[in-house]
Design a protein with these regions (language model features):
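C-terminal alpha-helical "lid" subdomain
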Residues: 1-27, 53, 57-61, 163, ...
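Pre-Walker A adenine-sensing motif
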Residues: 25-40
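Walker A/P-loop nucleotide-binding motif
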Residues: 38-61
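Conserved catalytic segments around the Walker B and adjacent sensor/switch elements
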Residues: 46, 64-76
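Sensor-1/coupling segment of RecA-like P-loop NTPase cores
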Residues: 46-52, 138-162
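A short helix-turn-beta junction within AAA+ P-loop NTPase domains corresponding to the substrate/partner-engaging
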Residues: 68-69, 159-176
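Mid-core helix/loop region of P-loop NTP-binding domains shared across ATPases and GTPases
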Residues: 79-85, 94-141, 145, 157, ...
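Short, hinge-like loop/turn segments at secondary-structure boundaries
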Residues: 88-91, 114, 163-166
Length: 256
């Protein structure tokens, strides 16, 4: 026991910088590019939607970095003014107009002067606050592509605004993480020398493809291995230990 407690944990490989190259990053970029390259008489609104934890925000940030897009993340308490101020700040407008209509005009003028794609994360907040038409105003008054990121029900929610809905050029569903993605995530975070393939794949299956939960379980497993002084762990070693996947633990799963 003393040896186990004093034994140094194996040093994991250094985590890689940037993002793990998961498919949803390519899907976000592809959707934005398709909107950007639309014909002159076509709309340029795009959607990337899917369940929470599928890595949509990371995908959106990647697409923004690759294209120089204006990126904003909507907040639950935003007013119309707060939305416009966030856009103005990202566009570098240092003297925003005092009224919302004039600030909207200022944003449109800036986007026409120096066009850049716009990415709006957490679009569901704007739908809930009835601010969809502001996005349409910007779209119709400029030539920019707008990519909106939201939850699984976002496409159906937007059908309430027919004039907005019929301007959506492409709607792309985000994909759950696969077994291969779990291995990419493990390697990206420098855990490939600690966690065997079959355990990483097991986490992907139990977490139903939710990227965030897969990463949480990979890190928790690495900490468990370090605590117990084990160099490498696999599915057999993990055994009946809990996997955090959003399910409510039962007495049996808790070993009671």
């Amino acid at each position: 026991l003393i040896d186990l407690l004093t034994r140094p944990a194996p040093a994991p490989a250094a985590p890689r910088r940037g993002y793990a190259p998961l498919p949803n990053m390519a899907l976000a970029l592809q959707t934005l590019v398709e909107c950007t390259e639309a014909e002159e008489d076509q709309p340029r609104l795009g959607l990337l939607y899917g369940n929470s934890g599928f890595g949509k925000t990371v995908a959106a940030a990647f697409a923004a970095a690759q294209t120089g897009s204006v990126y904003i993340e909507a907040k639950s308490l935003w007013t119309v003014r707060a939305l416009l101020e966030a856009k103005a700040e990202e566009l570098g407008i240092t003297k925003p107009e005092r009224t919302a209509p004039r600030l909207l005009r200022q944003i449109i003028d800036e986007l026409n002067r120096a066009p850049r794609p716009l990415i709006i994360d957490e679009m569901d907040h704007l739908v809930k606050k009835q601010m969809v038409e502001i996005i349409r105003d910007i779209h119709d008054a400029t030539s920019i592509a707008i990519l909106m990121i939201g939850e699984e029900a976002l496409p159906s929610k937007l059908k309430e605004w027919e004039r907005f809905d019929n301007r959506i050029l492409v709607a792309t569903p985000a994909q759950p993480a696969t077994a291969e993605d779990a291995l990419l995530l493990r390697d990206h975070y420098g855990l490939n020398g600690i966690i065997a393939d079959d355990l990483a794949i097991y986490f992907a299956e139990r977490c139903k493809g939710v990227t965030r939960r897969i990463v949480n379980n990979l890190r928790a497993a690495a900490r468990t291995a370090a605590t117990e002084g084990v160099d490498t762990i696999d599915r057999a070693w993990w055994g009946p230990r809990l996997v955090t996947n959003g399910d409510i633990p039962t007495r049996r799963s808790l070993g009671q």
